[in-house]
Curated annotation (Swiss-Prot):
Residues 776-792, 819-830 have a biased composition (Polar residues). Residues 127-512 form the FH2 domain. GO terms for biological process: actin filament polymerization; epithelial cell development; epithelial tube morphogenesis; positive regulation of actin filament binding; regulation of microtubule polymerization; regulation of tube size. Residues 66-76, 83-103 have a biased composition (Pro residues). This is Excretory canal abnormal protein 6. Expressed in the excretory cell and mostly accumulates at the tip of the excretory cell canals. It comes from the Eukaryota. Residues 54-135, 568-601, 748-767, 773-843 are annotated as: Disordered. It comes from Caenorhabditis elegans. GO terms for molecular function: actin binding. The gene is exc-6. GO terms for cellular component: actin filament; cytoplasm; filamentous actin; microtubule.
Length: 843
């Protein structure tokens, strides 16, 4: 029984006189269901049709009919039994639940109506608000009653006829509002408030998610659909390749084509595929655009690579230096393999170059390439010039070119056949590009490829390799590696030779310097011979002494004026005449000094000094304007004292023993001598009280110190220099003490003294000494009493530091006091002018 027969039979049964309007409603619903049966081919279609026929409230809840469904009428069953039972239509394979239950559910509400009042189709005006909603508010969770259930005698039927109600909707917005909404119709407001995501999904969840991620790669989906439909090139070619791998499958494509609902209800992935499926031959259009894009890109890459390989192969075949290199390798290998079966070789394979390159000698840093570079240093430069494109060609894969060419040829032929089968003017442009342009470029590229293949065979024959196993890529990589190692070895060789030359030059330079030093080294001359030889020559003062000469002369002039004053005072004594002033250096005359000239100073003589030479010349100039002393003989020791005593003839004779009355002045200054060695002073004087001179002898008395040694002038020093300590005290009376031979301490030579001024230390006053807290100079561990525990500053103790086991030593030994003796003591007598030291003070 067909669907039309079933509809006609149902119409006859339902449109009877007893059924009334309820039967008409049943017939209407049944006709809709029968019409939809043609569109149901899968479970998804059945579920979709079921959702359309179900009655739902605003919250998507199914409205169940209150009265139970009545049993079917018996006349319908009897008629169906009398009719011959037709074969039942085959159910859909994927349909699990048949649609009759919802059909019966839809019948029950119409049968449960007791009154024949017509069902209101629209909501009564009394129930609708008088103001459009502009604010998003909270929703009311209730169960909505359908208009078909409402009866006239019910409360909702009576309220539908009631008058309008005045409600303050602004107050509702204030209390229940969330956010404002765009002004739209009442139907849209109800639709938005019922459900947020009311999308129909024709794909699985995972499939829909992957498609949504892929669509984000396109800037504009609508523009993409237009470009595909009009055969325009797509800018996002990479995204188009991803899209080609995710196109709808056959089942998905069939479901998309059967969809007749609203497109706006579909999800974005389903909507995109739905629009794409509507384009005729959409898959072929996308595939053609991808092929054309890949074809142009591969041609731009492969064509230059093939040309480089052709050029490099020709350079290897025509290079004259490469056979020379192989000849050197063969000779070296046959020499090294002369005692085994590997010798006397006619050649070697290209793979053997890997082992020849890494062949090391008895030293790890020396290889076979080092020897080759040493023998033929220009070989590397010639090879680099002849094989200029070898480095670029070694990075190209010949197998990839072969595979790409085969792929392009197969793809072009396949698309050409597909486009020819598709009728229509829309594919004319694609067909011309594939059939004419692409074929021409492939033919030209194939000719170059065939030429490269022929060169590969020539190289195999050139190096005596097998054509079937010879690979152009491997050959180019071997020669490129050989070139790199040769360049590296050449750099090492040049660096080694440069270092060797620098080392030899440095050695020659050192040898030359040593020879020059030996030639310039003067002979060692005796100092006495040098001084004797330089007596008659002119003086050669140094530049350093010339600067000091002016200051020394100024200082010398001041000191000389003082000496002249002294000589004038000494000359005032009438009896006897004063002794003549002697020269500062020696008692000899100036003529004798002029005759003897000092030796010139030089760095070769260790005992010579520039300052000594300068002082000698300075004293010679001073002695030139002084009165010359008559030559005198050296006085004998016993006669020295009587001659010196003639100086004080006019002075009263000094008694041998002098009574020293107590002096109000301070004690005499006694110089301290170092302990353990007492040396006799060069000048011995005594301080004595002399009565005031008379009027007759009212002359100025100049103190003259008499010694057995020749007199010397004062040393010349710079202003501010510290004068040496002297023990000579000037007194109104000269006391001459006859002293036996006393060893005179020689004065420090001028050559050992510093010419720089002595820096004076600031003197410490007594008040400053009191303020400074001094540490005890004695060990406080041995003497606890010395520890200062008071707040008063401690005075520096004169006691020396002592250890616990050390024996006490005398703190000070008194200086020997000189006792005047009579001048009649002979030189052979024992010196008795020294008083024994007093007892030492013990700790």
């Amino acid at each position: 029984m067909t669907s039309d027969t079933i509809r006609q039979t149902l119409d006859e049964l339902l449109l009877d006189k007893n059924g009334g309007s309820s039967n008409e409603a049943r017939a209407f619903f049944l006709s809709q269901i029968i019409d939809q049966l043609k569109l149901i081919s899968s479970q998804t279609d059945a579920e979709r049709q079921l959702q359309k026929l179900q009655l739902k409230d605003p919250n998507d809840n199914i409205v169940k009919a209150t009265p139970p469904p009545p049993p079917p009428p018996p006349p319908l069953i009897s008629i169906l039994q009398q009719a011959p039972p037709p074969p039942p239509p085959p159910p859909p394979p994927t349909l699990k639940a048949p649609p009759p239950p919802p059909i019966l559910g839809l019948k029950t509400p119409s049968k449960s109506l007791k009154t024949p009042t017509p069902r209101p189709k629209e909501c009564p005006t009394s129930f609708l608000p008088k103001k459009e909603k502009k604010t998003k508010t909270r929703t009311v969770q209730w169960s909505k009653i359908n208009a078909s259930v409402v009866q006239d005698d019910s409360v909702w039927g009576k309220l539908a006829k009631a008058s309008n109600v005045d409600i303050d909707f602004d107050l509702l917005d204030n209390f229940f509002g969330i956010e404002s909404l765009a002004v739209s119709g009442a139907a849209e407001v109800v639709k938005k408030s019922t459900r947020k995501d009311a999308h129909v999904e024709l794909l699985t969840a995972k499939r829909s998610q992957n498609v949504a991620i892929m669509l984000k790669q396109f800037k504009n989906i609508d523009e993409l659909i237009d470009d595909v439909s009009q055969n325009k090139p797509v800018a996002e070619i990479d995204a188009l390749q991803n899209l080609f791998g995710m196109l709808p499958q056959s089942e998905e494509e069939e479901a998309l084509r059967r969809y007749t609902g609203d497109i706006s209800l579909l999800s974005p992935p389903s909507s995109f595929f739905y629009r794409l499926v509507q384009i005729q031959f959409y898959r072929l259009r996308i595939e053609t655009q991808i092929f054309l894009s890949d074809f142009s890109r591969l041609m731009r890459e492969l064509a230059p690579n093939v040309e480089i390989l052709i050029r490099t192969s020709q350079e290897i075949l025509t290079s004259p230096t490469l056979p020379r290199l192989l000849l050197i390798f063969v000779n070296m290998g046959n020499y090294l393999n002369g005692n085994n079966s590997q010798g006397n070789a006619f050649g070697f394979t290209l793979n053997s170059l890997w082992k020849l390159i890494d062949l090391k000698g008895n030293k790890q840093e020396f290889s076979l390439l080092h020897l080759l570079v040493t023998c033929e240093p220009d070989l590397v430069a010639h090879l680099q010039e002849e094989l200029s494109t070898l480095k670029d060609a070694s990075q190209i894969s010949f197998d990839e070119i072969k595979i790409s060419l085969k792929t392009l040829r197969d793809g072009r032929c396949k698309l050409e056949k597909q486009l020819e089968t598709c009728s229509g003017a829309s594919f004319t442009q694609f067909l011309e590009l594939i059939k004419i342009d692409c074929k021409f470029e492939l033919d030209e590229f194939g000719a170059n490829y065939d030429k490269l293949t022929e060169l590969q065979y020539q190289l195999a024959d050139y190096f005596c390799e097998n054509r079937n196993t010879f690979q152009l890529d491997e050959c180019l990589k071997i020669f490129n590696f050989l070139m790199n190692r040769l360049q590296q070895t050449l750099k090492e060789h040049v660096t080694r030779e440069t270092r060797k030359l620098k080392k030899e030059e440095k050695k020659e330079t050192q040898t030359t310097r040593e020879c020059e030093k030996t030639m310039k080294k003067p002979e060692k001359i005796d100092l006495f011979d040098a001084l004797t030889a330089s007596n008659g020559g002119p003086e050669s003062p140094r530049k350093r002494a010339a600067g000091i000469l002016d200051m020394r002369q100024k200082l010398g002039n001041v000191r000389i004026r003082k000496l002249r004053d002294v000589t004038t005072l000494e000359s005032s004594f009438t009896p006897p005449p004063p002794p003549p002033l002697e020269s500062p250096t020696d008692s000899t005359s100036s003529k004798e000094n002029e005759s003897v000239k000092p030796a010139k100073t030089s760095t070769n003589y260790e005992m010579c000094n520039d300052l000594e030479s300068y002082i000698t010349s300075l004293t010679r100039k001073r002695a030139s304007h002084l009165p010359k002393a008559p030559p005198k003989e050296e006085p004998k020791l016993p006669e020295v004292l009587p001659e010196k005593s003639k100086i004080a003839l006019k002075i009263e004779k000094i008694p041998e023993k002098i009574d020293k009355p107590p002096l109000p002045q301070a004690a005499p200054i006694i110089p301290k001598l170092p302990q353990k060695s007492i040396k006799a002073p060069s000048t011995v004087t005594t301080r004595s009280k002399v009565p005031p001179p008379t009027a007759a002898a009212a002359v100025r008395i100049v103190s003259v110190t008499t010694t057995t040694t020749p007199t010397k002038t004062a040393e010349l020093r710079k202003p501010g220099a510290r004068s040496p300590k002297t023990t000579v005290a000037t007194v109104p009376k000269v006391t001459v003490v006859p002293v036996s031979r006393v060893p005179v301490a020689p004065s420090t030579p001028l050559s050992r003294r510093m010419s720089a001024p002595v820096v004076r230390k600031p003197t410490m006053t007594a008040e400053k000494k009191r303020e400074i807290t001094m540490k005890p100079s004695v060990s406080t561990s041995a003497r606890p009493s010395l520890i200062n525990t008071s707040s008063h500053p401690m005075v520096r103790s004169p006691l020396p530091k002592m250890s616990v086991l050390e024996k006490p030593k005398p703190l000070r030994i008194t200086r020997p006091t000189v006792i005047p003796q009579s001048p009649t003591v002979t030189s052979s007598a024992r010196p008795s002018g020294l008083r024994q030291p007093a007892k030492p003070k013990w700790v």
